[in-house]
Each structure stands twice: as C-alpha cells, then as structure tokens.
C-alpha cells in the first residue's frame, strides 16, 4: 500500500488541495485487522477537516468512471512539498 505522509499537502484528482493531519485507527475495526483512517484538512474555504479510509485515500482514480483524469491516484502528494 502507498505511504501517506502526515503533514504533507495532497491534491485530490478533482483539483483541490488538502493537508494530512494524522493517520488514526478506525474504532470499528477489531483484532489483527485494525483499519487506518486518514484525517485531512481542506486548504481552501473554511479549512474543514475530513476523514477517509486509508485504502480509499491511497487508491487509484477509477479511470473508467473518470477517463478524462490524468492523475494516477485519488490523492497525490503536491510536488511543492517534495
């Protein structure tokens, strides 16, 4: 699975930017199958905070649903940070 970096800015494939605040455990997961959740904050508007399953945050863009999108991943680290 892709590495998501706390403190980095990521660009969503639809163009908005978000800062990863933390990666936490999902309270609904149990035992050896603890799921991770990414907490991230919008870098626009009211800077709202959001939570998304780690695997969804790190997932590929659905190229069948969004054939016009050139970005490979749903969220990609903004190169300005690198």
Label each PLM-derived region with a short phrase:
Residues 1-82:
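Mixed-charge, low-complexity intrinsically disordered regions
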């Amino acid at each position: 699975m892709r590495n998501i970096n706390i403190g980095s800015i990521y660009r969503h494939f639809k163009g908005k930017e978000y800062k990863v605040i933390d990666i936490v455990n999902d309270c609904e997961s149990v035992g050896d199958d603890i799921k991770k959740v990414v907490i991230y904050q919008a870098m626009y508007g009211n800077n709202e905070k959001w939570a998304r399953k780690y695997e969804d945050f790190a997932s590929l863009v659905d190229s069948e649903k969004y054939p016009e999108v050139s970005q490979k991943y749903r969220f990609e680290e903004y190169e300005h940070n690198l």
